Amino acid sequence: MQRAVLIRDYVIDHLGEAFSKGYIQVYYQPVIRSISKTLCGLEALARWIDPVYGFLKPNEFIPALENTRQLYQLDLYILEEVCKRLRACLDDGIPVVPISINLSRMDFLTCDIFTEVERRTQKYRIPHHLLCIEITESMFVQNAREIRIILDHFREVGYQVWMDDFGSGYSSLNALKDYHFDELKIDMDFLSNFTQRSKDIIQSTIHMSKKIGIRTLAEGVETEEQFRFLRDIGCEKIQGYFFGKPLPFDEMKAHILLQHIDVETEELTAYYEKAGDMDFTTDESLAIVETMEDGKLYFRFASPAYQDVLASVGAPTPRDSEARLNMPESPIRKKIARLLSHVYDSDQPYAITYTIDDQYLWLKVQKIAQLGKRFLLRCKLLNITRNAIQIEQMKVNGLEKDLYDLYHAIVINDLDRGTCQPVVFCRDYHKFHPGHTYCYQTTMRAFGYLSIQKEDRPRYERFMDADTISDRLSAHGGTLSEYFRTLTPNGFVWCQHVFIAIPDTNCRIFLHTVKPAIPNNLAMEKGLVKLYNEIKKDW
């Protein structure tokens, strides 16, 4: 207790001396982008290294300065040093990333903080996007209206405003409701015991933030397990001892080099932020893949469902799939390269079907972002063969309800031979049996007569027209989709009919899948009828 009192009195009386003699130093802690492990930011933190008392912890000097209304002097000193550092780096051609500084409630009450910040950024010619303002929810206990006006002013001229320690207090959600923030810094005390409940809270926070357009950063990350969890739920940025503790600038720089962490440029930041806009919390098959200048592919994210498909064809992890895809003579690589040549030149998704170990896989890819010859891609992968096997097993087990949640039919069609071969038929047709080959035209007409509602048959016949299918598939990247009311054990319901071209066949061989589209209710039917009346104008 006596030491604490002595330090408090010492700090109050020696602040000016600490500034002039360099006892107070700025330490920088790296902020890492989760999907790329690139350096995307730094936080500036005050450290007091005293000749009398040694290394003072922040909680040994900040409360004393706050109680004596001197804290604004410390914050402005840190701001000045950060601006000096940024200007020196810019002048020397050293890559820079945005640096965040902490402002306290006292800064807003004891000085014109906006003018003070502007004065220094103008003095050192610092672009506003390189400086981020961190505040805590305690800022809004009093004078909330005046503080909000100042924060809005910061944002209007290009500074980012972040909420620090989100979740550590009791009014975080109220602050989010009433104020505009560019980023949330999530307090990792949530994960101190790493229970499922704490994970669920973090995941919900990430999902909410993406929905309202706020970026996320988790601070206090210390383990590989925490990092992987946060990356996989879509938390964009990571800060903590796992990637590096706060250090003087030159030591921090050396640490980053030693860890082989690349520094983001402004262009790279904008590029990766396109992926950060996506919601990773999905049960669907989803992957984010990056293709580099040398043509190699790297998984930046893969959902459990996507990894499950990879494992079904002998790639237990995304890294194993990378190795297969990046082999120069890999036939799969060549097929996917042809697909990507279309994806790179368009904002539309493209899809192919290919085989691995006698299993049909369907891959859909869409461009998210481009930086020169680097691309971020959104991918969806399905194992059609395995799904078909699951369907057949469900039939054996009598699981009709689950069965109809998957596929009504899967058929392989060969236009050159004029044949079709059912892989799956969920209903029992005495004329069509999986594993047998039939005439395409005869089957198409019979299926239309038996299974398509009368009013939809003209559209169905145009959709199934063998003379135009190849051209239509080619024009739409290898996939076509349409909706028809199709007969099921529950009567006629809206089903999605999809054509998927088999690669290297000039769209002459394709899969035809049929699956229920939406719940069969009157309101939705009326909506679809209206939609189709509009679509008919383009036929």
Set out the residue ranges of the language-model regions.
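PAS-family sensory domains
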Residues: 291-346, 420-478
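Active-site core of bacterial EAL-family cyclic-dinucleotide phosphodiesterase domains
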Residues: 3-64, 102, 163, 218, ...
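Cyclic nucleotide signaling catalytic output domains
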Residues: 1-7, 14, 43, 60, ...
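The catalytic core of metal-dependent phosphodiesterases that act on cyclic dinucleotides
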Residues: 118-193, 208, 212-245, 531-533
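Sensory-domain boundary/capping and coupling elements
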Residues: 171, 387-399, 521-539
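Short loop/turn elements at sensory-signaling interfaces that couple input to output
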Residues: 39, 50, 246, 361-380, ...
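C-di-GMP signaling machinery
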Residues: 1-25, 65-69, 107-114, 147, ...
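Catalytic core of bacterial c-di-GMP phosphodiesterases, primarily the EAL and HD-GYP domains
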Residues: 34-43, 70-147, 220
